[in-house]
């Protein structure tokens, strides 16, 4: 009898906490707050609305160490993952791959990309392999990290001037964007807009995105885009944005912008995402990618 009661309590506990991971907020507004403490921040984030707040005055060393010039020195020849925004809008495309370039090469590419369609993200490995970068990122944890976290991920995002990422959403417990150089323009819409965004679940790259280009929609999506209501904000240097799970968002980069991302997940969040995680690993192990060789420069070709 006692054992049955314990099992019931355990199942009830799991149900309450896992179901909380699926809760969504649909209010079309962005909260703004003055940072007071991590406890206060977690209370506001639990409402699952976008939250904009100043973090530069709270942890100035983080922003000072990750400026555009410092990132160039820290990354230099490190290889970053580069994507072309246009690949997301190819008809019937369900997966978008990346190429790897040294950060210096990407920096040069972004400066000559007049059309604004290259950006880099998914650079978690670079940060984990760099003791200096890991140390800098860990300084922000006491101000952002919720309780009972079992998984922490950091990222560096940047793009050509004017590059606009596709509408996407995530399922993490906490995800923050922090601008350390330049500025970004973020557009967001709640989960209920998914019926107009034609959601694509890319389990090969564990990415959930929309093939609908909000800025210049394909004629087949134009009627749907007119029904989408959005909120938007500009994030300057020193500010942070909490992106709630299941909120669609798109980022527009300005010149020389550096965005740092911190993502935190609890055991309950990982449990709630097990079906998607399993599909990702199955897809990952069953997919064989062909690595494209870089195009040789004219001078190199002549030497062959």
Residue ranges and their predicted role:
Residues 1-240, 248-304:
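N-terminal accessory scaffold of Fe(II)-dependent oxygenases
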């Amino acid at each position: 009898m006692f054992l049955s009661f314990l099992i019931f309590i355990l199942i009830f506990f799991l149900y309450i906490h896992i179901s909380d991971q699926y809760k969504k907020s649909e209010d079309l507004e962005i909260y703004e707050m003055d940072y007071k403490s991590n406890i206060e921040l977690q209370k506001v984030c639990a409402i699952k609305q976008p939250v904009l707040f100043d973090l530069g005055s709270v942890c100035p060393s983080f922003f000072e160490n990750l400026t555009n010039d410092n990132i160039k020195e820290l990354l230099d020849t490190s290889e970053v993952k580069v994507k072309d925004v246009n690949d997301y809008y190819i008809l019937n495309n369900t997966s978008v791959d990346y190429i790897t370039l040294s950060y210096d090469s990407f920096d040069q590419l972004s400066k000559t990309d007049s059309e604004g369609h290259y950006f880099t993200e998914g650079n978690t490995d670079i940060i984990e392999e760099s003791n200096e970068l890991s140390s800098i990122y860990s300084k922000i944890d006491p101000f952002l990290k919720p309780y009972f976290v079992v998984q922490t991920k950091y990222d560096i995002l940047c793009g050509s001037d004017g590059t606009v990422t596709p509408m996407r959403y995530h399922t993490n417990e906490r995800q923050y964007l922090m601008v350390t150089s330049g500025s970004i323009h973020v557009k967001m819409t709640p989960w209920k807009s998914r019926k107009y965004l034609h959601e694509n679940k890319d389990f090969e790259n564990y990415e959930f995105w929309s093939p609908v280009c909000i800025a210049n929609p394909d004629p087949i999506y134009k009627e749907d885009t007119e029904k989408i209501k959005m909120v938007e904000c500009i994030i300057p240097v020193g500010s942070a944005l909490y992106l709630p799970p299941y909120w669609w968002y798109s980022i527009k980069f300005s010149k020389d912008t550096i965005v740092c991302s911190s993502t935190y997940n609890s055991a309950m969040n990982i449990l709630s995402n097990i079906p998607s995680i399993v599909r990702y690993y199955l897809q990952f192990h069953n997919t064989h990618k062909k690595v494209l060789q870089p195009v040789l420069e004219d001078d190199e070709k002549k030497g062959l």
